[in-house]
Regions:
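C-terminal accessory/tail domains of diverse enzymes
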Residues: 1-113, 126-229
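Short, conserved phosphate-binding/catalytic loop or strand-edge motifs used
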Residues: 115-119, 123
Length: 229
């Protein structure tokens, strides 16, 4: 079996985790309490809150309009501030426990998820090659059913925001020669129409999303799933 040219423990990653049940200010203060630091409300279009951990890495709490807001307590009035998305900084494998503690702190603060909530995992692939990306797509395709079942992906998301690998495109990518360039891979991914600068290109709604993989390092793969806090 051919192995990828790098150990996943050597790869950087980051997460976007969507939740509700608490407002953005409460979520930010939960992180600040965990780290023993302060919050900064920078606002803007995403109503961002910033919190640094003890390593100086910045975590963000932002608005995500796709979330269906709710509260655990009926007596609490909810509003747009209850649409919460956590953006982690660039993390190393050894910081997985830190991420877990962050999620636990949000849960203790009252954070919950519903069918509108999901999780994106961004994986650094600056060391990947066109061949290794081909391998990743093939592996994802062969294991998708198992992954979707294990992660309990919402069936509605499989038809919309978390679609399976596009088989015709995968077959075209597989046919590329071993020495294929990143530009050739990009051409197959976008079917001859460069959509790399279009943020909402249809390929972003695949479980394995390679848009930034074939544009510039660091490469990001997005795996979208329903995630319980």
């Amino acid at each position: 079996m051919r192995r990828l040219p790098l150990d996943f423990r050597d790869q950087y990653f980051g997460c976007e985790i969507k939740l509700t049940g608490i407002n953005r200010a409460t979520a930010a203060h939960a992180l600040a309490d965990l780290f023993g630091t302060c919050t900064e409300h920078s606002g803007g279009g995403y109503d961002a809150y910033r919190v640094k951990d003890l390593d100086g890495k910045e975590w963000k709490i932002v608005r995500d309009s796709s979330i269906h807001l709710e509260s655990r307590r009926r007596s609490v009035l909810t509003g747009e501030t209850y649409k919460v998305e956590l953006n982690s900084p660039k993390l190393e494998y050894g910081e997985m426990e830190k991420l877990q503690e962050v999620v636990r702190s949000l849960r203790r603060a009252g954070g919950i998820v519903n069918d509108s909530c999901g999780m994106h995992v961004h994986v650094d692939a600056s060391k990947h090659t066109p061949q290794s990306l081909k391998n990743v797509l093939s592996i994802m395709y062969s294991k998708e059913d198992i992954l979707f079942a294990a992660l309990k992906v919402n069936p509605a998301r499989i038809d919309s925001y978390c679609q399976a690998v596009d088989e015709p495109i995968l077959e075209e990518i597989r046919k590329l020669p071993s020495g294929a360039s990143m530009d050739q891979l990009k051409d197959r991914w976008y079917q001859g129409r460069d959509g790399s600068d279009y943020h909402y290109h249809s390929s972003r709604y695949r479980a394995c999303y390679g848009k930034k993989a074939i544009m510039y390092p660091p490469f990001q793969t997005l795996i979208v799933q329903r995630q319980k806090l």
